[in-house]
Amino acid sequence: MKTIRLFLLGVCLGLAHAAGAQSYLPQKSAFSIGAGPMWGIVEGKGNFHDEVGATTCGFFGMEYRYYAIPNIALGVAYNHLWGSKDNNSLSCNYVAPTFTARWLWAEDRQGFWMTVGVGYFGYKDDLTYGDEFKKGYLGASFSVGYEFAIAGGVGLQLRADCLAADFKYNGYRYGHSHHYYDDWDSSMSYLSLGVALVFGK
């Protein structure tokens, strides 16, 4: 019995070593999908976090990358932000072309990357003491992350994502945000810390 256990242990270790030797991160194209908690890091006068108070929201993201070389990629990203508190709700959608720079090591099984993008940021909130507010803005994104391979062409990312846009306060909200003037310019920024699964070739 002891011999069988040692044999099985040896087989498992051998398979694990073989899998590790064959694992690598995508080099040509990659698709990632992930999620995590999200916080507002700038007050953004008149927006959801300012009106209902600081609250943790949710973040969901998808991204496609085409690697011109293993260290440089062009792609497109989609992010969805949502939150609710005391029957007040937030829903934002962001889509943008992206540029990624990546540094690989450990025989292409580990990497660190940075991604920037500029695109459309669609903001919508619905507050219990006011009407729904919905508007599109020019948005920007900055993301950094560490990724490691778990199989051939499959990896896991630990990432931080920051989204920002210029929040144009206007008279539509004046009825219940009377402590601000019309056309008050303010920025809004969000930070998410999450994980993502990436796969490709």
Predicted regions and their residues:
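Predominantly the C-terminal beta-signal and adjacent terminal strand-loop region
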Residues: A140-F142, E147-K201
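Short glycine/proline- and aromatic-enriched beta-strand/turn motifs that initiate or cap beta-hairpins
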Residues: A21-Y67, A73-L74, M188-K201
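Outer-membrane beta-barrel translocator domains and adjoining extracellular loop/strand segments
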Residues: E43-E51, K85-C92, K124-F133, K168-S177
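Residues on the lipid-exposed face of transmembrane beta-strands in outer-membrane beta-barrel proteins
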Residues: A35-P37, M62-Y66, V76-Y78, P97-W103, ...
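Cleavable N-terminal export/targeting peptides
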Residues: M1-K28, G200-K201
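Residues that define the transmembrane beta-barrel architecture of outer-membrane proteins
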Residues: Q27-S29, V52-G58, S91-P97, Q110, ...
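Structural signature of outer-membrane beta-barrel domains
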Residues: M38-V42, L81-K85, G119-D125, L163-Y169, ...
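Repeated loop/turn-to-beta-strand initiation elements of outer-membrane beta-barrel proteins
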Residues: P70-L74, R109-F112, I150-L156, K201
